[in-house]
Amino acid sequence: MARTNTRKAILAGGCFWGIQNLFRRQPGVISTRVGYTGGGTPNATYRNHGMHAEAVEIIYDPAITDYRTLLEFFFQIHDPTTRNRQGNDQGTSYRSAIFYLDDEQKKVALDTIAAVEASSLWPGKVVTEVSLAEDFWEAEPEHQDYLQHYPNGYTCHFVRPNWKLPRRAPADAKADS
């Protein structure tokens, strides 16, 4: 039976190999693919992606998980306080970014960032870019599911076991109180 009710998230947080590898195991995630987005270069490739970020496109089942849960996991597995860098990887390709698809995703992204900053779980200011999703250029086959094919391959992403974002009321709920 084909799934008809799915949603999409597009996130960038350093080298796409590690982000994809961790997200593909999350409950409710149906599929992932890596690629390039957030820059101006058409038909982006690994060798020519200009100002694009390495990103992962996540297709998920909203009956099992939601966008906020995916974003909380995103902030748990990468450092959102380092501009244009994750681990040894440096440059705009490795920036922290959330590429929203609609106004609701933008609202959830901004609220989640506010919660991350209020939590003090990270030592600095969150520098994650929040931008409207643009064209997503799928990366070459050798980059798809890279760490499944090469389990000991390079990654700078990991789940921080004690990192748990406290739930807080959304900004709109506070204004109505």
Swiss-Prot record:
The keyword Phosphoprotein does not apply. Keywords: Oxidoreductase. The keyword Ligase does not apply. It is an enzyme of class 1 (oxidoreductase). Its EC number is 1.8.4.11. The lineage of its organism: Bacteria, Bacillati, Actinomycetota, Actinomycetes, Mycobacteriales. SUPFAM superfamilies: Peptide methionine sulfoxide reductase. GO terms for biological process: protein modification process. InterPro entries: Met_Sox_Rdtase_MsrA_dom, Met_Sox_Rdtase_MsrA_sf. It comes from Mycobacterium leprae (strain TN). Has an important function as a repair enzyme for proteins that have been inactivated by oxidation. Catalyzes the reversible oxidation-reduction of methionine sulfoxide in proteins to methionine. This is Peptide methionine sulfoxide reductase MsrA. The gene is msrA. GO terms for molecular function: L-methionine:thioredoxin-disulfide S-oxidoreductase activity; peptide-methionine (S)-S-oxide reductase activity.
